[in-house]
């Protein structure tokens, strides 16, 4: 039993504080010993890579190529344009670095398979829908791409190419999905997409979702 009660209590408090400080310092020393320092050169040497998920989103655009049974292209709403040369066993992206992910249509010229037109902006009307930035064209089977106008179209569900002249192209434009738009309608280019002229416009609330060229008469469109 302590004769000096106040002194005993203070000694206990001091001992407790000392013990806490000792444990804290011991933890800091061990943490410093176990921590590993990395040079900035280590991080500068690393490269970004895609580790998944390996999913490009839903697809509303796909096409084969006449005379080439194993060659196909598809456009996704969140992953750009993809190509397979082995009937779908493997796929490679051919649009990364050129344009955005949302694709509404893909068309390959029957006359020259190296010529590809892509209409950006998906056509699946839903709560979360991605718009695009017009028409893109490749003349080397997807190695490189160039923008070909119609940037305000937002959604291009269909592109059709003349069967014997890849410079004659038709584009069906849906336009803005949620408001009236003067950009809707059917457009035609006769110079490979350099310029476009509007050939059909019903009204600012009626967009185009599909186009068909008559296989027996390329002057007839539906």
Whereabouts are the PLM-identified features?
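Beta-propeller blade termini and top-face loops
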Residues: 32-222
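Bacterial Sec-dependent N-terminal signal peptides
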Residues: 1-34
């Amino acid at each position: 039993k302590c004769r000096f009660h106040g002194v005993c209590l203070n000694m206990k408090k001091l001992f407790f504080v000392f013990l806490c400080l000792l444990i804290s310092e011991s933890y800091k020393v061990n943490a410093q010993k176990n921590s590993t320092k990395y040079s900035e050169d280590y991080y500068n040497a690393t490269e970004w890579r895609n580790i998944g998920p390996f999913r490009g989103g839903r697809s509303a655009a796909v096409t084969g190529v006449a005379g080439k049974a194993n060659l196909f292209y598809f456009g996704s709403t969140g992953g750009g344009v993809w190509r397979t040369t082995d009937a779908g066993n493997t796929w490679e992206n051919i649009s990364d670095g050129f344009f955005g992910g949302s694709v509404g249509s893909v068309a390959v010229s029957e006359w020259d398979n190296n010529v590809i037109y892509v209409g950006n902006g998906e056509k699946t009307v839903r709560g979360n829908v991605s718009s695009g930035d017009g028409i893109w064209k490749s003349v080397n089977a997807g190695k490189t791409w160039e923008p070909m106008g119609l940037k305000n179209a937002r959604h291009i569900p269909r592109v059709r190419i003349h069967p014997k002249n890849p410079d004659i192209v038709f584009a069906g434009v849906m336009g803005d999905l949620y408001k009236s738009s003067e950009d809707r309608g059917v457009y035609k280019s006769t110079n490979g997409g350099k310029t476009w002229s509007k050939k059909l416009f019903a009204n600012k609330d009626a967009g185009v979702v599909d186009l068909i060229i008559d296989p027996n008469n390329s002057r007839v469109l539906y």
